[in-house]
């Protein structure tokens, strides 16, 4: 998943700041216009090998070398709406794909494995801040597939004594996020003079985390994380969807009258919240102020319309279709 959202932000830092420290092999399916553009624009240098492959077929890939010290898995199907009406691809990529990666690591004596999970595996909350030891209670097929992957990782660790660490970030935002997600979808709609669509009444709360803070957290786990441990990554910043929409609209001198409320997503979780003291104990802390990071993100989408404009029309069509199919699936 090296050319996806978090994976690409991680890869950029790895290549730009640590290019002489590692030999890196990246795998990505390149199954959308955004990952293809990411692939085209990054000068990776001599220490990087890229393979356009599916992790489900990891054992069929011909690597130039396979004596890896570390595998980090960013690859995932991640759109909740899609998972409601088409869960199969989520099980294939997020569960079977992870199983195949772990088998590859086991068979090739890979020393360490890091699974990038999500805070959504804990399920919804009102006042509780989930800790890494809390029981998983996923609500959507997407989060269930990620929770299943976490359990597969746990089983491989216990059965085969593998060095596995799991990272569960909060809701990420920032440059290179596909515009089907709330913040970039809203920004792109505003730029193109469309209404900002919000599910339900907009009261759903998310724990917002700038992607560059996430990347730093991953590097900290690589550096200091302990085998078998799970690490939440959070920021302590919480906003509901109405607040996010209003903040973005205000940057363009627009009022909340530009918000369009649409029928809520089936099984929409009210709030995600995680305690990230364990990662903080390793010496990590979020560095980016939310307002400044949101401004930086907005500027990036303004300056990089060529990156997202090709796919946004289809995303809007798919969004309408997904909402309709998801509701019908839920009714059945």
Place the predicted regions along the sequence by residue.
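N-terminal Rossmann-like NAD(P)+-binding domain of SDR-like oxidoreductases, especially those catalyzing
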Residues: 1-172, 296, 304-307, 313, ...
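Short alpha-helical
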Residues: 5, 78, 177, 239-240, ...
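C-terminal substrate-binding subdomain of Rossmann-fold SDR/epimerase-dehydratase oxidoreductases
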Residues: 9-13, 30, 53-54, 190-332
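Conserved strand-to-helix beginnings and helix N-cap segments that scaffold or border functional pockets
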Residues: 36-37, 84, 179-180, 208, ...
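Residues in well-ordered alpha-helical elements
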Residues: 59, 81, 88, 99, ...
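A glycine/serine/threonine-rich, flexible loop-to-helix segment
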Residues: 128, 179-187, 263
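The catalytic Tyr-centered alpha-helix of NAD(P)H-dependent dehydrogenases
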Residues: 138-145, 169, 175, 179-183, ...
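Hydrophobic alpha-helix immediately C-terminal to the catalytic Tyr-X-X-X-Lys motif of short-chain
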Residues: 148, 152, 156, 186, ...
